[in-house]
């Protein structure tokens, strides 16, 4: 039996129009325009904020770099009281796009290796999927809005990576001037060359290397199919034709020609979610209750809200070492773009095998070594969650044998995964449990609504 609720039906009630992120000249996001957009959306959907049970605010790409980005996101999250707020770095955004686009589900359905190419305004995120799992991610600085134009065709925004590409093809970019058709074609063609190089896993020239934001994708396994997501994908799949005053439509046009010429030879699938890929997994509440063998070193500090979950991939049902636990934590943090010691995190794992002291001690030691800054920071709670019945024993080992002096929360009989955020409620002494609210980002499969 499981205490986790299962989603049996999902229905899209209303879709908003797409709003390009409103940037101001002082390197901030226009909060007033966002508020007006959200207000109009509620009116058109015939809903009020009180009607919404849960949601998510996700910061990605160029918007994440703006001076007031986090403050705006936190404001909307806190005003609703029910929203989670996540900052998506390159790896996490690639992971979310691969899931949200339907590429991960497609790889499971087709029993194939699928490469999702998420083309946004400032970056491209790659997600390599196989058998329903994301194997690897990568990102590089090419995007549809690295150059933006006004109604007269004059350049009103030029990002650094665009200047790198322009310099590579001998074009000078100047704000307020018109970019000639010939120079525009040179820049777009070179950007598509870079996309093709990364899609075929051959990014060997100097410009490709200069634009790389993460590690490269591995050379194996062989790719069977390609999917596209992000704003530019709407042009690739011909769902959008209107020019948005940037390079997006031109990039898609040249990329379609590259696909037709088999420069990217794999079959192209359309899983359907395109520009909404990173937000299609709208957050949902589930409720769980912990086991009664939990460990809380400082009960009075509860409740805590919106702790992101990092799920470990290590198999703890067989023999393992503390070093393997540490490596699994580091991999999870990297996968989700979390910075250990700066971000609160709940380490979640499946527990199997005998609850012998030696095994639990190795687990605890691996956790401490994987979270050294958390251990050293008395203001940062160590949150550990498992599906087995060893929460109290693990907590005792962490505090009494490994001398963790900060707050330790060790909760058992709970099932968590990546894209979950957890609220841990106040301790209930009569039943010796804590209530948990799990907010999950849920992703549809291709063909679902």
Model-predicted regions and their roles:
Residues 4-11, 15-116, 129-250, 273, ...:
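Nucleotide/phosphate-binding catalytic cleft detector across ATP-hydrolyzing
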Residues 332-333:
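A short, well-ordered alpha-helical element
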Residues 263-268, 312-314:
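Short beta-alpha connecting loops at secondary-structure transitions
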Residues 1, 124-129:
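Short beta-strand scaffold segments in enzyme catalytic cores
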Residues 247-260:
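Hydrophobic alpha/beta core scaffold segments
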Residues 118-120:
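Conserved catalytic-loop position in the HRD/HxD motif
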């Amino acid at each position: 039996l499981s205490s986790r609720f299962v989603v049996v039906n999902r229905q899209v009630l209303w879709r908003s129009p797409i709003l390009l992120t409103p940037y101001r000249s002082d390197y901030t996001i226009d909060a007033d325009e966002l508020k007006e957009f959200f207000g109009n959306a509620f009116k058109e959907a015939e809903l009020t904020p009180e009607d919404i049970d849960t949601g998510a605010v996700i910061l990605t790409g160029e918007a994440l770099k703006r001076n007031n980005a986090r403050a705006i996101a936190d404001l909307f999250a806190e005003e609703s009281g029910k929203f989670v707020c996540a900052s998506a770095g390159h790896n996490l955004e690639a992971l979310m796009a691969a899931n949200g686009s339907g590429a991960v589900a497609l790889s499971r359905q087709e029993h194939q290796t699928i490469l999702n190419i998420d083309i946004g305004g400032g970056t491209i995120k790659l997600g390599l999927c196989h058998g329903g799992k994301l194997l690897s991610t990568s990102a590089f600085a090419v995007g549809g809005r690295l150059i933006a134009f006004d109604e007269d065709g004059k350049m009103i925004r030029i990002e650094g990576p665009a200047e790198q590409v322009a310099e590579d093809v001998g074009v000078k970019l100047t704000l307020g001037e018109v970019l000639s058709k010939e120079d525009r074609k040179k820049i777009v063609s070179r950007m598509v060359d870079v996309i093709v190089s990364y899609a075929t896993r051959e990014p060997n020239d100097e410009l490709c290397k200069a634009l790389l934001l993460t590690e490269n994708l591995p050379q194996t396994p062989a790719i069977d199919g390609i999917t596209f997501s992000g704003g530019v994908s709407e042009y690739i799949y011909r769902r959008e034709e209107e020019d948005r005053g940037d390079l997006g439509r031109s990039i898609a046009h040249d990329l379609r020609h590259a696909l037709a010429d088999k420069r990217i030879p794999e079959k192209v699938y359309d899983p359907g979610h395109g520009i909404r890929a990173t937000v299609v997994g709208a957050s949902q509440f589930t409720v769980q209750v912990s086991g009664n063998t939990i460990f809380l070193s400082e009960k009075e500090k509860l409740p805590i809200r919106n702790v992101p979950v990092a799920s470990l991939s290590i198999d703890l049902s067989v023999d393992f070492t503390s070093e393997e636990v540490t490596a699994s934590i580091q991999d999870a943090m990297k996968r989700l773009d979390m910075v250990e010691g700066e971000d609160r995190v709940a380490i979640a794992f499946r527990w199997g095998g005998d609850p012998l002291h030696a095994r639990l001690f190795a687990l605890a030691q691996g956790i401490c070594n994987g979270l050294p800054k958390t251990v050293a920071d008395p203001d940062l709670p160590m949150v550990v969650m498992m599906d087995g019945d060893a929460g109290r024993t693990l907590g005792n080992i962490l505090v009494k044998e490994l001398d963790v002096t900060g707050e330790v929360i060790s909760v058992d009989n709970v099932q968590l995964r990546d894209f979950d955020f957890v609220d841990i409620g106040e301790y209930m002494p009569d039943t010796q449990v804590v209530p948990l609210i799990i907010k999950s980002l849920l992703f549809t499969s291709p063909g679902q609504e």
